[in-house]
Curated annotation (Swiss-Prot):
Taxonomic lineage: Archaea, Methanobacteriati, Methanobacteriota, Methanomada group, Methanococci
Biological process, per Gene Ontology: DNA replication, removal of RNA primer; mismatch repair
Catalysed reaction, written as an equation: Endonucleolytic cleavage to 5'-phosphomonoester
Protein name in UniProt: Ribonuclease HII
Keywords: Cytoplasm, Endonuclease, Hydrolase, Manganese, Metal-binding, Nuclease
Amino acid sequence: MNEDIKNNLNNSDEFNGKIIVGLDEAGRGPVIGPMVIASVKINENDLPKLHDLGLKDSKQLTKKKREELYIKISEICDVKKIVIDPEKIDEQMEIINLNKIELGAFSKLANHFIKENENISIYIDACSSNEQSFSNQFKAKLINKNVEIIAEHKADENYKIVSAASIIAKVTRDNVIEEYKEIFGEIGSGYPSDPKTKKFLKNYVHENKGLPKIARKSWATSKNLLKEIEESKIFQWVK
């Protein structure tokens, strides 16, 4: 997209009756916990308020800063979220892939706002490097095919409205992870590469002969752990 248009979106102070919506997710890759899809809606003339917050992609902010911005964003914008728990992810992954699960949630939130507003632009962080294909698939799910769609890979780094959605999604997921820790103890971040997460899952599986409900059973990490248990049973039987 033209840089002038990007700058206008991030600094607009003229109201033309347009509604701006940003969409992003948190938690695509983790083996533990939900995937959260978040949307933020704002009148275009209020965009400078977001700009003044100094928003960035949620991954570039500290936990404390994200939590502070979460409150401020919620005061400025109409915020909505969809939390897809691990069991639901596993259920849907038997039929469709993760991109389509995400697209379905994105379109559900977008359609909510489209029902209320005809003059609307939707900015979305594309979950595919093929932005045009993603945009076409997203638009096909909308109740109004004429709304303006700006779908870009890493849009959370380029547009304040998407940065805001990124922060809402990330803080929401982080809060769920903290709730898990109160029940299970240290579980790490939930990502397969996190040593604390791997240790928790391995110990849990060996002690309970199965995965906790907070784990995504369709993930390779989970399948490998269950395979280890089955192989150990066979080994013991052979002995």
